[in-house]
Each structure stands twice: as structure tokens, then as C-alpha cells.
Amino acid sequence: MNFEVVRPKTLCNRLVVVDGLPGCGKTMLSAVISSLERVELFKYSYEIEVQCILHHFKKADIDTSASLIQYHLDLIIYNQMMARETNFRYSDLSSVFKSVDKLKYFKRLFGPGDEKVPDIIEKQKPIVHLVTHCLSAYSNPLLDNFKN
């Protein structure tokens, strides 16, 4: 039996990925990228890295991996827009306090949530910002979601 995973509507339609070896300056570059208009704070997503590697080693097909990655990207932006899983630890590199627009993230704590979030995402068009480790050679399932 063949099944196709179909999700007609997605939330994450914009993505920037900073990829590289450990210690090569991804965090420094990500601080600059996060300061650009509409770009969210950077986030590490090991779940996405694992899906790409599973596909590379033929433990998951491209459709399954791409669908799970899109689901996870949608979950990331949905949670970010409600300040869920947002880092408020003052000294962390991915902290709100390192952002040029700290107020934006504090407002989200008290803003509308749940069913209003997809409309907010549609209106504001935020850009998910991922930092990955040595993923470029295995990134087909991720790139499959952004063919256009």
C-alpha cells in the first residue's frame, strides 16, 4: 500500500538556514541574520537534522521526511508567535535579550494565541531561522518543502 502525506495549508513558508561545522561562526552570523526585518530568533532543530539524516540512510522516504519537517517547521513558527519555547535566559546566545527587537517577544507573551495565530502569521509573514550542523549534504527533505 502506498500512502501520501498531504497537508494542504502550511504556516512556515519562509525559512533561512545557517549551516556549518561546529565552531565555525554560525551563532555570530545568526545574530546578524536575526536582526533583519521579519526574521525570528534563531533556533536549533535537531528533529529536522535527524529527519534529513534518516532519509539519507534510507530509513525514511523523502515524502515522509519532508512532511515531518514541514510539520515541525509549522510547529516552530506557531510556537514562536505565541512565545512558547522562547528563550528568556539572559546570558544564552539565543536569548530574547540578545535580540534587537526585545519588545516584540515580550508582547507575544500577552498577545492573542491559539486560533488567531495562523492569521497573525499570514499577516506578518515571519521568517523561521534555523541553525544546523553539517546538514547541507543531507538537506533534500528540508529543501523539498521550498521548491518554489
For the regions a protein language model found, what residue spans apply to each?
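Pre-Walker A (Motif I) flank of P-loop NTPase domains
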Residues: C12-L15, P126
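Pre-Walker A adenine-sensing motif
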Residues: M1-K9
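Short catalytic/ligand-binding loop motif for oxyanion handling, primarily in non-cytosolic enzymes
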Residues: G25-T27, I48-C52, S136-S139
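A conserved segment at the C-terminal end of the G1
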Residues: C24-E40
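Short, glycine/acidic-rich beta->alpha junctions
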Residues: T10, L21-G25, L130-A137
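Hydrophobic anchor at the beta1->P-loop junction of P-loop NTPases
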Residues: V18
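PAPS-dependent sulfation machinery
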Residues: S45-H129
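PAPS-dependent sulfotransferase catalytic domain
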Residues: I127-N148
